[in-house]
């Protein structure tokens, strides 16, 4: 018998594939970011070096397929397609929440297939902060073993939990549990928001807790409050539908969250990353890598080749952006000047950030 968690996972996947679930009134903020064009790049575009070292693993480009799915039999071919594409292109990938496999071990294959299809890729496991108190360190280690993960992501999705009728609304003790896991787990720990962004205040707390990287998961991409609107509407839960509509665009947009989160830790820029130019802007703002999920849901349902096609297009766009900025490698791009204007400039100014320094060549942060 399929568990409630497993049923919810396939429901989420179908909704993301078939319904408009992105932010409606809030953007990720990339339109407020301008890369400085170099009319004389003095580079051979075909010889640019896009590779990075990320949490102990070599990636051929600073990009990861963000956590999408797992935990239902129908998600196994989806994860297989994503993993095979990541392996072919030399990028990383995260699995969806492994909670379903803890609730029902028969669902483990939907996650194990990722390592089977991507034996050398950077793969991270995934569990919710609301569940780590229940599972403890031993349970978390089982998640790592399940997929031979290179790292573990602990996702923060309290906005979604607050709206879900079945959500876990008790957020007490999570930071202490994160500290404990970071101190004893033999793998890097990534803290990952899921669409509402990470603030400066929380970044400092996470750095002190010993996390290895922060995935900002900013507003401007998939809205999980929006996903819950469709679930609530289908079940006739008008109270949850109202809450989802109200909080559809809640959170810190991705660009602002990248800058808020700069605390001497690797940053993954997630939330509304849709083009290679978005990737380039993220790196220039200080991210170590970028990631996206929604652009690959439809292609993954079609198969590996469709995923490779979309990924290759984004990486080609990224290569061109690097070339036009006169950047031979990722460190050059991190040092490249970038201008922040508009709403993002106003927001960050009020938050006390001097973004004018970003317009000067050289990574001074």
From Swiss-Prot:
Keywords: Cytoplasm, Flavoprotein, FMN, Isomerase, Isoprene biosynthesis, Magnesium, Metal-binding, NADP. Coiled coil: none annotated. Its EC number is 5.3.3.2. InterPro entries: Aldolase_TIM (IPR013785), FMN-dep_DH (IPR000262), IPdP_isomerase (IPR011179). Mg(2+) binds at residue 161. GO terms for biological process: isoprenoid biosynthetic process. One of its GO terms (molecular function) is magnesium ion binding. FMN binds at residues 67-69, 97, 126, 192, 222, 272-274, 293-294. Belongs to the IPP isomerase type 2 family. PANTHER family: ISOPENTENYL-DIPHOSPHATE DELTA-ISOMERASE (PTHR43665:SF1). This is Isopentenyl-diphosphate delta-isomerase.
